[in-house]
Every structure is written in C-alpha cells, then in structure tokens.
A protein has these predicted regions:
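Conserved small-domain helix->loop->beta segment predominantly found in fold-type I
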Residues: 81-90
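Extended, leucine-rich alpha-helical cores of fungal transcription factors
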Residues: 1-76, 89-202
C-alpha cells in the first residue's frame, strides 16, 4: 500500500478478500484489537489511491463519497484511539504506538483526499484562473475540503507530538516517518504565503 501510494498507482499486487463484519465489533474495547481500525482505514486509503491518484482526477462526488467513509470510521474509532494516545495509565506501550500509527493513517487519508482541493485554492490565491464552471455551492465545497486538508495536517502533527513527548515512541517508525512529509508540506504550502488568509487557522 505504501508503494502504491508513492507511485499513485492501484495496488496490483493485492486483492481484498475480507469477510469480517466490521459493523459488529467483537469487543467494546478498542485496545483489544487495534489492528481492526488500522485495516479499515487502509482500505479507505486504498480507495483514495485507486479513485483519485491512479486516475489523476478528483471531483466533488468522489470526495463526498470517500468523506462519508472517513466520517463513518471516525464515528466508530476516533475518540477511543485519541484517548489511548493521551491516557497512558494501564495501557501497554504497543497499544499506544498502534493507536498513534492508526490515527496518523486516518489524518493521512484525509490529506490524500483533500490535498488536490488545497492546491486548487492556492493556485486561485496566486491569481491563476482555474475555475472551469460550477455553482457557488461547488466552490464552497472545494473550500471546505481545502480547509480539511489543513486541519488534518495540524491534527497529524499534534497527535504525533503528544506521543513523542511521552518518550515511548520508538526511534524507528518507517510508516510515520514517511507520511510526515505530507502534513509538513501541506502546512508549508500555506505558511509560505505571507498574505494567505488561511494563516488564521493556526
């Protein structure tokens, strides 16, 4: 999946064959199976790679569809995983690291989906006319997704920093080290323009 995302190509060396009923959790404690939300979020990321980056196009319709999947995932897992990264009493080191990695994957998935809209907004701000029609509602939706890219980047960094401050994070975390480039570049794109009104978000 990491290689597929880097190349912007569909994962041709894998296939989805899953019979797990994710809507019926076996336990109310997320710490009992941290792999479950991780598998789910990577399946959503796979859809972003296939629907957006392999086809090199994005639309409001596709963004809305994947956004609903991300919201469904968040409603089930986000709060519990966040608690595991900030409340360490009685929680194993591996569980905290797993929760952090899964949360970072979630924010990374949001950034993958919404970054094209942020780039669109930056081009517009720089004076490049890219509007190819569309209603006012379409433009509001694009702005909403652009803002979501920034929010996800900030949340990614905050989540990672909170766990790093506990000094339980291993020095070598290849997945997190690799994906940190995305939120960093997303935030730098915005902050590099002194006149950008989006700086107020930070």
């Amino acid at each position: 999946m990491v290689i597929s995302t880097v190349l912007g190509r569909p994962p041709s060396t894998s296939d989805v064959d899953c019979t797990v009923k994710y809507s019926i959790p076996e336990s109310d404690q997320v710490r009992s199976n941290i792999l479950d939300p991780s598998v789910q979020i990577f399946m959503i990321i796979e859809r972003v790679v296939v629907e957006v980056y392999s086809r090199k196009r994005i639309s409001i319709r596709i963004a809305d569809y994947v956004s609903r999947q991300l919201k469904g995932w968040a409603s089930r897992w986000l709060l519990d995983l966040t608690k595991l990264t900030v409340e360490h009493n009685g929680v194993s080191r591996s569980t905290v690291i797993g929760a952090c990695s899964t949360l970072c994957s979630y924010y990374y998935g949001i950034m993958l989906l919404t970054r094209p809209f942020l780039i669109y907004e930056i081009y517009e701000h720089l004076g490049a006319s890219l509007r190819g029609g569309g209603t006012q509602n379409d433009h509001r939706q694009k702005r909403k997704y652009a803002d979501a890219a920034l929010d996800a980047a900030a949340s990614f960094v905050e989540t990672l920093r909170a766990v790093i401050d506990t000094e339980i994070m291993p020095r070598r975390m290849p997945l997190i080290v690799w994906v940190i480039v995305t939120p960093s570049s997303t935030l730098l794109l915005t902050l590099s323009d002194p006149g950008s009104s989006r700086q107020r978000l930070f």
